[in-house]
Regions:
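Conserved beta-strand signature within the Rossmann-like core of class I S-adenosyl-L-methionine
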Residues: 155-162
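Conserved SAM-binding loop of SAM-dependent methyltransferases across substrates and taxa
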Residues: 62-74
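N-terminal auxiliary segments of SAM/dcSAM-dependent transferases
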Residues: 1-15
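A short glycine-rich, Lys/Arg-flanked "PGG" loop and its adjoining helix->strand segment in the class I
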Residues: 140-154
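Conserved class I S-adenosyl-L-methionine
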Residues: 50-61, 77
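Conserved alpha-helix/loop element of class I SAM-dependent methyltransferases that forms part
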Residues: 34-53
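S-adenosyl-L-methionine
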Residues: 81-119
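Class I S-adenosyl-L-methionine
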Residues: 164-202
């Protein structure tokens, strides 16, 4: 496979020098303030992943968050809906451990559906790093947040990346996200400026 291709109505391009990919011209990782791997490390640190924990990683991408969590000794289940993204990950040297670390289990499927298969309280922590709201609004829905709440153990932690889309135009999503997380049952919902996401606790 070439590092760029058109498939399933989308144009995919691997940008190895930046450690990211583009889908329809949109970069899937933070590349301005820091490189994607460092960004993933920061998210995992913010979540407080520890050795022996069971972690759910929603939206695998190139696998940096799953790798970072597994390298801390956590058992990671990671979900990716787009097989084309995983094919690009196999061509990315920095993603090699995603396919080699025995602590990582990859599920190919729609997270909205796959999360229903997990038991109540199955995970110690959830790292939810979805595409932009305009691309995958269902992963920002109250229905999905209810499921993330359900699969977390009591006292379990959530990190939810959102970024700050639309805020310059007065159409930000953060207030709505925080409100729906609270409606789903989460407590201690706090914004983390460094990682551009919310932390919350069950």
């Amino acid at each position: 496979m070439q590092p760029c291709f058109f498939r399933d109505g989308k144009f995919y391009k691997l940008l190895p020098e930046l450690g990211t990919i583009e889908i329809n011209g949109v970069k899937m990782h933070q590349t301005v303030q820091r490189m994607p791997q460092e960004d993933a490390e920061n998210k995992v640190n913010t979540l407080g992943v520890r050795k022996g924990e069971n972690v759910l990683d929603v939206c695998t991408g190139l696998g940096y968050s799953a790798i970072a969590a597994a390298e801390r000794g956590a058992k990671v289940t990671t979900i990716e809906v787009d097989e084309n993204v995983l094919e690009l990950a196999k061509q990315t040297p920095t993603s090699k451990k995603l396919f080699e670390n025995p602590l990582i289990k990859i599920i190919v499927g729609d997270a909205l559906q796959e999360v229903n298969e997990f038991d109540d309280g199955e995970f110690d922590a959830v790292l939810h790093d979805p595409p932009r709201f305009s691309f995958a609004g269902e992963l920002y829905s109250l229905v999905f947040y209810h499921e993330l709440f359900r699969v977390l153990k009591k006292g379990g932690r959530l990190f939810h990346y959102t970024g700050k889309p639309g805020e310059k135009r007065g159409k930000g999503i953060r207030a709505g996200v925080a409100r729906r997380l609270a409606e789903a049952g989460f407590n201690k919902i706090e914004w983390n400026e460094e990682t551009l996401g919310f932390t919350a606790v069950k």
